């Protein structure tokens, strides 16, 4: 009787996208933090702006939430929650650059399924809102969400971070130590926000930028810088 053959092993290249996804992260999550700027009329815009970009082999979307509709409050701190979904990143960043604002892109490498999960999070927000078809262009779709905007949140920073956390749950771990409204807001503004309960989490773009620059709990792939004064 022939002797039994020893076990043989060989490496087989997978054709299963899910297996490839688990082994080779190839998507990017970018937290885009825009700095303050001075408008052409001399008005100072000191609060900055945050948006979230999800880039994979199948899509490249930038989620840009802000006070792009009716506003209210003493300082215009609340209003309609408008989400702009850009399918053309260059069109988005061109608009930011036109303000002579510097935008820092904090880039994280993620798996495709993480990017899809974050994309689905925003899809649910859009589903619960209303598309403003009159504002749609070849580069962007615009939606009025069911939840209004407020300076303390939901705002551009908190919504971007919430979306990022779907993909990277610990991306804001430790950020509460950088929640320092006094770095940006004057006394009157801080008192007005305190009357609304104060900030329970990091909500200002400048504070987010400092946190990601100094204490990001997740390793950055790189940091890109867009725009600035020419």
PLM region spans:
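Active-site nucleophilic cysteine motif
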Residues: 47-49, 146-178
